Amino acid sequence: QLEKGDFVPSGYELKFGSGKIDRIDTCEEENCVYVKVTDYKTGMKSFDITALYHGLQMQLPVYLNAAVHVEEQRHPGKEIVPAGIFYYRIQDPVVPAEDSEEAVEKSILKELKLDGLINGDEAVVAHLEHDLSGASVLFPMGRNKDGSLSKSSRALPRETFETVLKYTKEKENSLKEAMFEGEVQAAPYEMGESTGCDYCAYRDICGFDLRIDGCSYRRLEKFTVEEAVAAMWLTLEENGFGSGGEQG
């Protein structure tokens, strides 16, 4: 990652509130600083923008918002550009031993490829990986023959990417307000095959049981990326936020 791009580590295990950002990388230019965050994972967790919309997977964008604030303090007067949010697997990948050395290396790189979401601004892409051609072995992105980003790229236009971060702030604030107001009822969600009870430490004592009348899951809708972003825009507009993220 360091050899193929311009980002360099600027912080490890940075604590804020009760959270901890595993790694912050930055790329500094004369008038701006690009920043991305990486969270190390031992499992196969992947970023799900639908889960973010519903307030279930907010860690990475919350971390990036915090990292942007940190870099604003470090670089007063410079524009801080959020570049990406990533999960990185730290466990050793298992690949077929009978493969050639080149095939083994490709398999390892594929298994260790970052997962997440990228600010698709061309300046960001160029700083992440020089001379990107075809599918990247490092980031969830690739280029078509005409130079455009491929449809499979996990990248959003800059304004859309920043909308995701603005929505995250708004969602975080609304969840905090709900908790402060005492909303603690057991109302687990169901989305696809997952539920809020799957890994809940309190499932045996909360009193929620589908066999009891009145107990049912809150069914959350799955969205495409485009649908999730549109829903985020709508929420921001309903709450009085314009395209610049300022409340009216």
Residue positions per predicted region:
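Structural signature of nuclease core domains in nucleic-acid processing machines
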Residues: Q1-G248
